[in-house]
Amino acid sequence: QVGASLYDGLSPTATGASDMKFVPRFVAAEREHDAGATDSFEVRLDRRMRREAVEWATRHPAQAAYLALVKMGRMWNIWPNEPSFSTWPVRLVVAGTYVPVMILALVGAWRTFHLGLPYMLCWLPAVYFTLLHAVFVSSIRYREPPLLALIVLAVAAVSGPISGTPSRREGP
């Protein structure tokens, strides 16, 4: 069931952040149509929210695309989006730990690109989670899983020479 989450990310009131204040309105509307229904209430509620989210995005493609960009920005922002976490000390700690990893991940990607698929796959979680949260709501906390794979590339940036073949140690 993704209806509520989808509507949270694609609706006239969507901002990219989560705000589930719309749920009681949907619950009340679905309860009005409850008589004689064969499916469970939760299934019908999910379908209603999903349908309205898809219809809104279909009718407003430019707004949906803009909202996707906003959500991507929220996910990869260098500091917290939440105002209560936007004091300068918190911003500096978050940016001070995140920005170096990202810079090193980019350098590592450049250094390992010629090594093929295994290193390219380190970007796959970042692409997947970014696209997923471009549809649903987004926050910097959703970048944590892909950061683990990006750290592998960051290590490649600070490690020794990288070649296409394993290094061989010479005997004594």
Regions from the PLM with identified roles:
Residues 1-70:
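Membrane-proximal stem/loop segments at transmembrane-domain junctions that anchor or position
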Residues 55-122:
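Membrane-interface anchor segments at the N-terminal boundary of transmembrane helices
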Residues 1, 121-128:
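Central hydrophobic cores of alpha-helical transmembrane segments
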Residues 110-118, 151-172:
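Membrane-interface junctions at the ends of membrane-embedded or membrane-associated helices
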